[in-house]
Amino acid sequence: MNTTEEQQQIAHFLSKQHVLTLCAGNGMDMWCANCFYVFDAGQMALWLMTETHTRHGELMLQNSRVVGTIAPKPKTIALIRGVQYRAEAVMLSGDEERLARARYCKRFPIAKVMKAPVWQLSLQEVKMTDNTLGFGTKLHWTRT
């Protein structure tokens, strides 16, 4: 499988999921949170909403480098599919924020009443395990 095919497989998986685990830290403190997200394939980015006063929000303001996972709960080992990622987190503003918020609220209509900031996780590296392609199959993507 070439890099383009791997990226397409990863993008397809990310577009079908909606919950990620986000891990943020500042060198002294670390915290994980589960967040709903929308995937932007054109930018290879994840958009989420979270307040700056949450523990993970405060940590992302201190250190934009984050890691996390996206993994549904399969019924058997043969169906395991999931992603580990490394990303740069930034709170969006202006036109970027309006576009991301509109897409987020379209996917999660309840978010229309929320005033939380929209963050972009620009994926830097992704490793996907996909046992549906053969036990232990790994797909990789790295931003160049």
UniProtKB/Swiss-Prot annotation:
**Disulphide-bridged cysteine pairs:** none
- Superkingdom, natural source: Bacteria
Note the SUPFAM superfamilies from the entry: FMN-binding split barrel
Q: Which family is it part of?
A: Belongs to the UPF0306 family.
* Protein name as catalogued: UPF0306 protein Spro_0510
> Organism classification, top ranks?
Bacteria, Pseudomonadati, Pseudomonadota, Gammaproteobacteria, Enterobacterales
